[in-house]
Amino acid sequence: MDNNEKEKSKSELLVVTGLSGAGKSLVIQCLEDMGYFCVDNLPPVLLPKFVELMEQGNPSLRKVAIAIDLRGKELFNSLVAVVDKVKSESDVIIDVMFLEASTEKLISRYKETRRAHPLMEQGKKSLINAINDEREHLSQIRSIANFVIDTTKLSPKELKERIRRYYEDEEFETFTINVTSFGFKHGIQMDADLVFDVRFLPNPYYVVDLRPLTGLDKDVYNYVMKWKETEIFFEKLTDLLDFMIPGYKKEGKSQLVIAIGCTGGQHRSVALAERLGNYLNEVFEYNVYVHHRDAHIESGEKK
């Protein structure tokens, strides 16, 4: 059995954690539909015992997802140490997924569901303070996550699609590059590892015929690409990424999020994200996906 076959035969454990209200339950439901054995809110101290069960070769535990959150606050503090210990001592492949969202979006979701945040301590603490405290408590586990997903702008359907994209394919290459266009006026892409600002390029918005279109339209794309500044920028950008991306993979990252922003996220960033996605697909044998976060907002299209 070669090394690739050995890797495929190993059991896989995905620890799903993150901010309350960011979508952990939805992710667990999605993974369960995809055939994962799912456990909700396992105390971190029991994680090594659970991994021991997985190592016994039970077929039903070959792919496992465990949701862990701050409901057991004291127990949660040991999570990073436990994950590190299990990774160093077990043959089980362990990934950590961290879900987050903006404070404003989390507040909105809690108001919609009328549920109490687990750290509100029966009304002794305000919702915004509970969210801020949780964000602080989770900063360490976030720092070791293989996947960080910002669900602020994602609908439940879009979040499920992203999870399926990552985990549904048995032959899935473990390194994924997500290229996202966005508009600065709608907020920065919070889960981005690299952010590039292209607002210095000539803006198609000021060409009347191009204003209602997006960077997905040929006329807008050609307008953005015809400038010398664009060519110089793209050449320097790809040189940088050619150097950096292999290093990210070598360091054990499973995902790299590259965000390209312009003013509204409709023209320049969309065109360049498309071009970059095509380039990365040609140069690397990784999974490359392109997403346009705000193009539909500015163009007036329905999502």
UniProtKB/Swiss-Prot annotation:
InterPro entries: P-loop_NTPase (IPR027417), RapZ-like (IPR005337), RapZ-like_N (IPR053930), RapZ_C (IPR053931). Keywords: ATP-binding, GTP-binding, Nucleotide-binding. GTP binds at residues 69-72. The keyword GTP-binding applies. It comes from the Bacteria. ATP binds at residues 18-25. GO terms for molecular function: ATP binding; GTP binding. The keyword Amino-acid biosynthesis does not apply. Displays ATPase and GTPase activities. Belongs to the RapZ-like family. NCBIfam families: PRK05416.1. This is Nucleotide-binding protein SAR0820. It comes from Staphylococcus aureus (strain MRSA252).
